[in-house]
C-alpha cells in the first residue's frame, strides 16, 4: 500500500493508475495476465472488439500492475493472489472476467489471427511459396522475388511464380527483404493474439500448459469414466439414480434364469420351463430306437418340431417396479 510519507514522491497519475487497477482486480472472480507484446495494433483492436462483451482488458506498466496485485492481496488477506505478480512478463495486460479459466483460454485462443512475419523474426514453420500468378503487373517486384530466391517470370502480362518453393526453414531468421516479399504475396505464417501468462481463480493459478486441453480427448475420458462407474455400480449392486433400473432388471433376468434352470415354476417362467422340457424330451427321443417311439413322436422328430420357447416379455420393467417395492420372499416373489 502507498503510505503517506512516500505518496508525495510518486506521480499523481501513477497513484490513480494503481487505484484503477486495484478496482479492476477486485471487480471479478477471475483475473488473467496476458502477453500482448507481439500483437500489432490492427490485430489488437480486432481482438478487443471480439472480447469486449465478455471481459475487460486493461494495459499498464508491469511495475504498476505488480504493485496493484500485491496491494489487493494484502488488503483482502489473500497471499495466493500476490503470486499472480510472478507471471508478469513482457508486454503484459490484465483481463477481468467471470468466464471460467478454460473457457477464457479457449476464447482468447480462438481470437488469434494470421499475420505477416516481420524481418528479423524466427520462422515459426517452413514457409512455402506456391507456383502461380501473383496478379501483379511487370515491375520491380519481379526483381524482388528473384532476389530472395523465388523463381519468377512474366506470364500472360502478369508476374508469375514458376514452381513451389520453400523460401525459409522453421527456426531460421527471416530477412527484411523476404518479409517484404511474403507480405506482398499475402502470406501470413504467424499467428498473433493474446497469450495467457497466468489465470487466477479461487486460490489457484493456471498456466497455458494446464489450460490447453484436447476437448475430444477430455470428453472421451469423461465418457469412459462414466461407463466404468456405471458398470461398477451395476455389478457391485450399488444402486444410484442412474443405475437402479438396470440393477433391478439384471436381478429379474438372473432370477428368471435360475428359475428356468432349476425348474422352479412361476407364472412368468412356466412357458419357458415347459418349452425347455419339451425340447429336451424331443432330443432324448431322438436318441432312442424307433421301436421305443410311438408314431406321433416319430413324426415330430422327423419334422424337427419343437415347442415354442417364451421370449422375455416387453413389460418386464413394469413388473420390476412392482417387485422392487415388495419384500423378498424367495424366487416366486420376483415374478
Swiss-Prot record:
One of its GO terms (biological process) is ribosomal large subunit assembly. Belongs to the universal ribosomal protein uL10 family. InterPro entries: Ribosomal_protein_uL10, Ribosomal_uL10, Ribosomal_uL10-like_insert, Ribosomal_uL10-like_insert_sf, Ribosomal_uL10-like_sf, Ribosomal_uL10_arc. GO terms for molecular function: large ribosomal subunit rRNA binding; structural constituent of ribosome. This is Large ribosomal subunit protein uL10. Forms part of the ribosomal stalk, playing a central role in the interaction of the ribosome with GTP-bound translation factors. The gene is rpl10. The keyword Protein biosynthesis does not apply. Gene3D superfamilies: 3.30.70.1730, 3.90.105.20, 6.10.140.760. It comes from Methanococcus maripaludis (strain C6 / ATCC BAA-1332). Residues 304-335 are annotated as: Disordered. It holds the Pfam family RL10P_insert. The keyword rRNA-binding applies.
